[in-house]
């Protein structure tokens, strides 16, 4: 009788050990990188410091868009060979609909301190775009996002002085229309 019970338990344990774990049942670890997650918690924009200067204001940045499993979907690298001609991320924010990640940058070497090149990651097109290409040169780092996907930036020029880089004028665009 003991032998039968032992054999039965042995077969039971063997059967349990042979069962496969269904895919997707293991909880995904949160993506661990400096940055910000999208409002829908499906993507994370990682802001990594690269180059010879590890800390602001002279560091250079790499932006990686990752899914929550940690896979890199897109990368925008601002590292320069000499560490003084790249860019670093200053302000960054997701649009409320989670379709766009927007960030402003400054020169790592202090060149053109008036020009805050601003970029976006377009989730549907899986690509980065420069906002300046659609608005003109951005002269203030603090862009404003409003639902669902509007951006307002301050750009070069006034009605009386098209070369002005101190005051400029506001430009508002819908991110989903920038092609």
What positions do the PLM features span?
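A short beta-strand motif characteristic of beta-propeller blades
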Residues: 73-83, 127-132
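Positively charged n-region of N-terminal signal peptides that target proteins for export
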Residues: 1-4
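Acidic, small-residue rich beta-repeat scaffolds with periodic aromatic anchors
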Residues: 10, 14-37, 50-54, 121-179
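Short glycine-/Asp-/Thr-/Trp-enriched loop segments that recur within the blades
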Residues: 81-88, 138-141
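Short, solvent-exposed loop/turn segments at conserved positions within beta-propeller repeat blades
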Residues: 54-59, 110-115, 165-168
């Amino acid at each position: 009788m003991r032998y039968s019970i032992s054999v039965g338990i042995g077969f039971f344990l063997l059967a349990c050990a042979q069962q496969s774990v269904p895919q997707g049942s293991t909880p995904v670890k949160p993506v661990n990188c400096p940055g910000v997650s999208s409002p829908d918690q499906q993507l994370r924009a990682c802001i990594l410091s690269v180059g010879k200067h590890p800390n602001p204001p002279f560091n250079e940045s790499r932006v990686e868009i990752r899914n929550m499993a940690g896979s890199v979907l897109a990368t925008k690298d601002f590292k320069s060979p000499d560490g003084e001609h790249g860019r670093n991320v200053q302000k960054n924010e997701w649009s409320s609909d989670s379709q766009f990640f927007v960030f402003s940058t400054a020169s790592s070497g202090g060149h053109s301190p008036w020009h805050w090149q601003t970029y976006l990651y377009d989730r549907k097109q899986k690509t980065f775009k420069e906002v300046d290409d659609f608005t003109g040169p951005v002269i203030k780092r603090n862009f404003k996002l409003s639902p669902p996907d509007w951006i307002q930036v301050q750009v070069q020029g006034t009605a009386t002085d098209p070369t002005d880089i101190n005051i400029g004028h506001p430009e508002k665009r819908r991110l989903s229309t920038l092609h």
